[in-house]
């Protein structure tokens, strides 16, 4: 059981308490001020800490920031659209490098291979089904070569409806044996960074699904419970319970995984049976010695761009946008981001740059 792992009452966990624990660590280290770097949830922790203890923050970088006005369900309920976009970007990426990955020379061919593997591995209600990308010239069968445009127009008009019908039919399938180490697990990582795309390609070339080990299941259980505890204890978003039956209707009518994800997250079902026991801190950077920095990818799949802008406004921060959709800017292969952040920490805490390029990616 969870409590035997020494976590105590996990449902009392919240970011404000963690921030106060963090300050105890600062005191123990004998540091009057600290520099703080936080990514993803760490941006919320950093903003809360800086609000509670502004006199102890020197320089603060928030990378891929959460929306401080949408804690927490509004943040989760706006991820699906960017994740759908990211999927198609990945299919485009593989197709443009077919000589390297051998997954198909059009996004549709790559998608078809991906979708077949997903179907074999996961079959049933939890299968993450998505629509096909548009067909291109390379997808036209030989017998239609004289009427390429007519074929593409007809195909691309009909395919979304066909996909929706197929998803509705598959909704009634019995699930396969569950192997949590699968293509969808790796694809989930690939949402966050192109760094993982080569792993997706390698898996697609040689699929080997595996179940979680006993130790992995225990670790996942602890992680999930802590995540749920912090989220539900602090949630200030009004749940939309009508989205729950809407999810069921959408599911059996063939909605894709990203539409369903947004509906489920915003419904509040994750926190069913629990009530918030605190209110999120109204974060502010008004009392900080130096202005913080917020880094945000335009198409971030986990913490959408607009939320980062709101965090920058609340914290009176320098706002620097990065091309692409990586969740985390400084943490990947982006020398210009490294230079900006390192100069901010080690030299003058002033940032004049407002834009960064997409991180580089090792295609192998």
Regions found by a protein language model. Give the residues of each.
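Conserved acidic catalytic loop of the alpha/beta-hydrolase fold
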Residues: 19-33
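Alpha/beta-hydrolase fold active-site neighborhood
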Residues: 119-286
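Conserved hydrolase catalytic core segment
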Residues: 32-68
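Conserved alpha/beta-hydrolase "acid-adjacent" motif
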Residues: 301-306
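Short beta-strand/loop motif that positions the catalytic acidic residue
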Residues: 294-296
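Catalytic histidine-centered segment of alpha/beta-hydrolase-like enzymes
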Residues: 326-335
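Single conserved hydrophobic/aromatic residue that forms the stacking wall/gate
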Residues: 1-11
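A catalytic-pocket lid/entrance helix-loop region that shapes and gates access to the active site
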Residues: 53-109
């Amino acid at each position: 059981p969870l409590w035997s792992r020494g976590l105590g009452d996990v449902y009392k966990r919240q970011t404000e308490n963690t921030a106060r624990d963090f300050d105890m660590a600062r005191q123990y280290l004998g540091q009057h001020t600290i520099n703080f770097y936080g990514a993803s949830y760490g941006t919320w922790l950093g903003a809360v800490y800086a609000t509670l203890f502004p006199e102890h923050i020197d320089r603060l970088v928030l990378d891929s920031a959460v929306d401080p006005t949408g804690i927490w369900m509004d943040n989760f309920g706006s991820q699906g659209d960017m994740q759908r976009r990211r999927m198609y970007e990945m299919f485009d990426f593989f197709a443009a490098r077919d000589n390297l990955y051998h997954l198909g020379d059009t996004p549709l061919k790559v998608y078809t291979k991906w979708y077949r593997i997903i179907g074999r591995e996961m079959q049933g209600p939890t299968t993450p089904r998505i629509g096909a990308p548009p067909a291109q010239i390379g997808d036209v069968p030989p017998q239609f070569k004289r009427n390429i445009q007519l074929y593409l127009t007809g195909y691309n008009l009909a395919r979304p409806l066909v996909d929706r019908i197929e998803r509705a039919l598959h909704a009634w399938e019995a699930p396969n044996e569950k192997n949590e180490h699968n293509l969808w697990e790796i694809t989930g990582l690939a949402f966050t960074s192109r760094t993982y795309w080569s792993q997706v390609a390698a898996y697609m070339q040689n699929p080997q699904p595996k179940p979680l080990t006993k130790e992995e299941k225990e670790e996942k259980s602890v992680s999930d419970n802590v995540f749920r505890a912090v989220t539900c204890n602090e949630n200030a978003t009004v749940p939309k319970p009508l989205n729950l039956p809407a999810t069921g209707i959408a599911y059996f009518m063939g909605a894709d995984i990203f539409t369903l994800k947004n509906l489920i997250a915003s419904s509040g079902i994750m926190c069913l049976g629990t009530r918030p026991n605190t209110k999120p801190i109204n974060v502010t950077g008004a009392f900080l010695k130096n202005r913080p920095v917020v880094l945000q990818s335009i198409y971030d799949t986990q913490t959408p761009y607009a939320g980062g802008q709101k965090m920058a406004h609340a914290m009176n921060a320098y706002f620097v946008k990065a091309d692409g959709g990586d969740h985390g800017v400084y943490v990947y292969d982006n020398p210009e981001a490294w230079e900006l952040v390192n100069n901010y920490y080690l030299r003058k805490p002033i940032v004049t740059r407002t834009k960064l390029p997409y991180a580089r990616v090792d295609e192998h």
